[in-house]
Amino acid sequence: MKKTKNNLPFDPNGRIFQWGPVPGKFFFCSMFTAVHYKHFRAKYKENWSETLWLFLNGRMFWVNDLNDIQAAGVKVFLKYLLPLKTHKKIYKEWQGYTAKLLKLHKNIDTADLTKLTDTQLKKMWVQYHNTYRDFWVTSSIPELANYGSEKYLKEKLQAIIKNENELMSAMEILTAPTRISFYQEEEIALSKTDNIKKHQQKYFWLKNSYAGTEILPTEFFAERKSKLNKNLETEAKEKIKETTAKKIAIQKKYFLSPEIMAIAQAISEGVGWQDERKKYIFMILHHENVMLEEVARRFKYSTEELYRAWYFEIEQIIAKKNLHAKLKKRKTGFGVRFFHTCKELNAQETENYWQTYETKVEKHITETKGAVASKGKTTKSQGVVHIVLDPNNIGSFKQGEVLVAPMTSPEYIFAMKLAGAVITDAGGLTSHAAIVSRELGIPCVVGAKGSTKVFKDGDAVEIDTVSGTVKLIK
C-alpha cells in the first residue's frame, strides 16, 4: 500500500473518488470486499486500486484516488469488456453462477433451517457463498471497467467534438443502455398481472439494500398497481427505439468511427449488466439474511452483531468459534484498507479517515457544478430541495421536489419517480442516477460535489442542464 503525508493512502486535496456515505451494513458488503482485493486479481490478473471502505454510525463510505481507479478501470475495460468475444464469454459464465444461485435459493426456501445439523448448515453456507463469490468475481468486470471507460470514451470524442456542451450531450446519448431496467421489468409485469400474490412472491425483495432486507407485502404492490400507466411496456420499448435512433444520429453527425461506436456500445452493455446484477443481489441479500438469522438464533448472537462480520466469519461461528468480543469492538466503527492485502481498521482509524476524506464546503458557497446526465424537457428548471441520505426513509418526499443525494442506487427509485430533478454529490454519466433520470425524462446533474452540504431542505434552486450548475435562488 502506498503512503502519502501522515500515512494517508490518498492526498485529501487531490482528485478523490467517493461512493457514499449511504446507509449500509458491513456483512452485506463483505463478499465483494474480499473479491475486490483478492479473488478478482487471482482470476483476471488485474485489481482494484487502493481502497478505504469505512463503516460508521450505520453508514458506509468508499474512497479511492480518482486517477488510480480510472487507470485500473481502463485496463479492465480494454482487456475484458471491450473485446466482444471475451465480454460475451464472461457474461455467459456469470449467467451460469446466477442459475446456480437461483437453485440454491429454492433449497433455502424449502428447507427448515432449524432442523439442519450444524454440519448441514455449514455446508449450505459454504456452498452458497462459494457460488456467490464466483458471481461477484465475474460481474466485477463491468463495475471496475465503468470507472475508467467513461474517461476513455471522452478522450476519444474530444478529438472530434470540440464544443464541451455538445461533447457531454453526445456522451449522454452514446452511453445510454438499450435494455429495460429491472425496475421497469417489475413495473411492466405488475401492470399486466391479475395475480398480485404471485407477483409479490416473485418481487418481494424489491426494496432490499446493503442496509438491510424486508419482505414487501401484497398491499405494497396492489397500491402501486392502481397508479401504474397501462402503456408502460409500449412506452419503454419506444424509449429504447428512440435511444438507438439518437445513437445513430450522433454517429452520422460527427462521422464517428466503428471503433468509437464499439467503445460506446461496450459501456452501454456494461451498465445494463450492472443493473441486471443488482436484481440478483437483492434476492441474494434476502437469502443471506435468512441463513444469518438462523445462525444468530442457534449460536446466541444478535443479528446486529453478525452484520459486523465477514461472510467467512459466519462459517467460523457455525464451527463454534466465539467471536462476540471481536464483533463488539466493531460496534463503534469499523473499516478496511485494501490493495493486494487487506488491513482492518479500528473505530478511531475509521473515524479519522472518514473526517479526512468526507467532502467539506465553505459556508458562503451557494452553487455546485457537475456533469449533465439528463437534460429533461428544458435547459433551466427550478424546484425545492429535498435531501435524501437514506433511500428507505422518503415518507415526506413530495411530487416535484429536487432530490439531492450523495449518490443514488436502485433503492432510491421510489423517490426518483416523484422527483422533478436529481442532483448527486458523486457519479458520472453511467451512474444509476444518470440512467434512471433519462428513463424518467427529468433533469439530472451528477458529480455536483458537496450538494448535500451546500443546500438544505426547503431551499429553492435553479438547475442549468447546459452548464451543469445548481444555484441557490435568493
Where is each model-derived feature located?
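Non-catalytic, soluble scaffold/interaction modules
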Residues: 1-474
